Structure formats: structure tokens, C-alpha cells
């Protein structure tokens, strides 16, 4: 793409120039602006700082650095807030149903402020999971020059010589309930797992999305794996601000960057790093916001050609800080580019192409580390996020399939219409090896809000059942989940999807080799069960949950609210 130089205040001049805008300027003067400032770009800083969660409680210093960078580069910083939900704190409660809703609220906040205030650009700062897609969706809707600053990953905790993170605590709950861990060890893990600020440390959802944003070119190189407490994260925020001012001069906008080829690059990086199932849902929504033709089947196309190169949690050994020390996302991208698995001609926010950004990165990983494997000797030959179909999910669903000892299982259904009763059954020892748990009426409309299921899956793993019990749901999974799990089943139960018609004890097959999710009954029996079915009454009749349930599209389309 050819870039062009334009005036620095192409939008804000609508409220700062001319005699008729004297009242507008008067309000700016009240905040300390001077006449010369009205020729400068007005740049929004969407600040996700919050003391709700450690993921976001370290963001203010990044916002301060970004503000300084904007001013040093000749811009005016206009700060506004965006909300967050702590997935880790809300997990396993009714509050988790607000997590995906917050993605939409965040994107609405950014679009509203940028458009309502005629901002010339926007720098978005976020930490917890939904901050990431929500931020980018808002950037794409507003489509002014924009850059994303990720808050940074958390450092690992430690107990008895073992690295810990938040998922360690969820799994410890299951171990304790199964009699495999003492109360004292559970207490010490609880206290030591999270030593400070930053987002959850494995290749969970926040780190997955930040890595993908770096691959998209909407964030700076190396920025996605930096730790929040480290000075380089603050320096990166300041540099991001200066790069954004240059992008305003060149009129580089989010939709120039987030193209179909760029999304293919991002998904290839997600596969290569062993990223979260949530990335499937979020990139369907991001593509929708960008106006890009991208379907759930495109993930499978990229998966089949992309190896898993990184040994990262939840199913691997290392954390994001280890990936950073090993060369970060640029190292992974250069390996994929050299193998012909990345589009090098995609533009980045720096004004350079992907190939130009990666020019000086070596094609092979360093020999003194084992976080990133050589492309000739990958962790797995194909990606880990598979799209399964079958009579239980004709629109598709998402499974993590790498690292499983048994990639195929058939077992009796154990049916639950809510998460809490499923968790109680696991902790009470009522779920046995070979069972296939079904958690339904938890989709975008049915939940509503499509909650994540880390509490049940963590309990299964802690109880030693992670490899021997299957779990399928029309809800979602945390990025920290691993095991024989299948989520995003679509159509969902509340929309009359076939998952609604599973009976206790029915035979279900999960086949990650044939990409199949099947209820083993006849078509005639399935149709018989549908007779007389009615959608359940809405769980909410007012507020954001009611709006979400009424408007949300299928998970196979990203669970977006504006698919009209």
C-alpha cells in the first residue's frame, strides 16, 4: 500500500476551527489547551486501567507513558476510560456471563468516544481477555489511525520449586477435592500463584490475542510478550504513541492493516504458539468489524498447514515471559515467513511491511532455548485448534486437539443445564473415566453471554480425569483449558441446536481425527425429540444481558451484536 501525508487534524478541525466553534474551543481552554493546540491531532487514549484485576491494575503507568509520547510527538492526548471484567475472578459464577458482554461494551465505548469527539487517532490500552478483541473491534469501527498497547503479561509465581499461574489454582481445587493435595498446599498455591500485575501468564486468551495483534501489525514488534512490571513495557507504550502520530501523518488506518491476509497471518501465529480457543470467536467478530470475509472454516484451512512451534502452557511447559526471552513473536513469525506460511507484504502500523519488520530476525530459533522449536522439528505438525462438525454441531465447534493421548472417544452423556451442577458433580466424584459431560444452555443467547468453563475443566484435570473425560458445551473455555474439550457448539441449545436434545446416557463421539462431533442416535429419533420443544424463557429481561441475548449472533459468526 502506498502511504500519503495529510494534515494532522483532519477530523478534530470539525470542532476546533472557525468562528462557529468558539463555544467548543472555550471548553478546551477550560482544560488548559492553548490556541496552538488546535492545529495538533487530538488523539484518544482509551485507558483500561482498573483495580478490579491484576491484568489491568498496572495500566496507568502505561497510559502516562503513552500520554507523554503523544505530547512529545506533537499531539494532544485525550484520555477516556474503558471497563473490564476479571475473567479469573468471575469464573464459575453468574458474573462470568458478563465477560463476553464486556467485549461489546468496550468496543462501543471506543467507537462512541472516537466518533463523538472527532478524534484524529486513538491509542488503546488493555489487559484482561476481552479488552483485546473489544479494543480492536472499536478501533476498526471508528477506523481512524490507531495502535493497540497490551498491558503485558504477569510474572510466574512459585511454590516448592514449581512455577505457578492462575490456572494452577483452578487445578489445585480439583486435586484437593480428589484427595490428591492437602489444604495447606492449596492455601499456599492460592497465595503465591500471582505475584503482581499483568495478564495471566501462559498462552491463554490475553496473551494469545496480544500475539495475534502483533502479527496483524496493529501493535509494535516484541510488545506482546513483555511483562507488565518491566520498564521495557512502559518504553514500548511511549514508542507506540510516537508511532501512532506518524501513522496519522501517513493516514494508516486499522482497516488498511486488518485484511484477510493479515488475519491469516494472525491465525497462523495463534496456531504456531498454541493459543486459546477464544481466538476463534474473537477473530470472527474482528473480521466482521473489519468488513473482511472470514468464516469458521478458514481457521481449519490455516490450521492444517501450520505447525505448533512453541511449548507453552496450558498444554505445554513454558510461559509468555519465556517466549519473550527466546525471541518473542517476531522469531515465530520469521520462521513462518521463511517457510512460506505468512504473507510478508501485509502493512503494519509502522508503515513497513511484515517482511520489512522481520528483515533482521534470524530464520531459525536460538539453540540455547527450547521454548520455540525448529520448524523442521515442531511440537505438532498441524495446528491445535480444530473445527469439528457433525449432527451435534452442523455450524461448527472448536476443539483443542494436540497433546491428547486419546484423540477419539465415545462415551455416555452426562447432561447438565448449568455450570454449577456440573462442577458439583465433578467435585463429588460422580463423573467417571469415559463419560462425556454436556454443558448446555450456556451459549451467546442461552447463558446468556457464553461463559467460560475453567472451573469444571480445571476440576477435571485436578481430579486426574483431564484425558479420560470429554466435555462439550455451547459455552466457551478459558484460554487456560486443556483436555478433551469441545466448545462453541453451534447452533446453541437455546436456539434449538441439537445439543438441546441429548438425553442422559446417550452415546456421544468426539473424533479429533475425523473432525467429528456426533450424537449416536438415528436421524428419526433426533427429529422425534424435537417435537414440542420450546425455547426457554430469557434469563434476563432488562439490561445488558437482555440486550446481548436478544441480539447476539451464533458463535459460528462470532457472537456479534450488529450482524443485521
From Swiss-Prot:
Keyword Amino-acid biosynthesis: yes
GO annotation, biological process: isoleucine biosynthetic process; L-valine biosynthetic process
InterPro entries: DHAD_IlvD/Edd, Dihydro-acid_dehy_C, DihydroxyA_deHydtase, DiOHA_6PGluconate_deHydtase_CS, ILV_EDD_C, ILV_EDD_N, IlvD/EDD_N
Reactions listed under catalytic activity: (2R)-2,3-dihydroxy-3-methylbutanoate = 3-methyl-2-oxobutanoate + H2O; (2R,3R)-2,3-dihydroxy-3-methylpentanoate = (S)-3-methyl-2-oxopentanoate + H2O
Pathway annotation: Amino-acid biosynthesis; L-isoleucine biosynthesis; L-isoleucine from 2-oxobutanoate: step 3/4; Amino-acid biosynthesis; L-valine biosynthesis; L-valine from pyruvate: step 3/4
Binding-site residues, [2Fe-2S] cluster: 55, 128, 200
Manner of cofactor binding, per the entry note: Binds 1 [2Fe-2S] cluster per subunit. This cluster acts as a Lewis acid cofactor.
GO molecular function: 2 iron, 2 sulfur cluster binding; dihydroxy-acid dehydratase activity; magnesium ion binding
One Pfam family, short name: ILV_EDD_C
Entry binding sites for Mg(2+): 87, 129-130, 452
Cofactors (names): [2Fe-2S] cluster; Mg(2+)
Gene3D superfamilies: IlvD/EDD C-terminal domain-like (3.50.30.80)
Enzyme class: lyase
PANTHER family reported in the protein's UniProt record: DIHYDROXY-ACID DEHYDRATASE DAD, DIHYDROXY-ACID DEHYDRATASE, MITOCHONDRIAL
Role this protein plays: Functions in the biosynthesis of branched-chain amino acids. Catalyzes the dehydration of (2R,3R)-2,3-dihydroxy-3-methylpentanoate (2,3-dihydroxy-3-methylvalerate) into 2-oxo-3-methylpentanoate (2-oxo-3-methylvalerate) and of (2R)-2,3-dihydroxy-3-methylbutanoate (2,3-dihydroxyisovalerate) into 2-oxo-3-methylbutanoate (2-oxoisovalerate), the penultimate precursor to L-isoleucine and L-valine, respectively.
Family per record: Belongs to the IlvD/Edd family.
Protein name: Dihydroxy-acid dehydratase
Organism: Polaromonas sp. (strain JS666 / ATCC BAA-500)
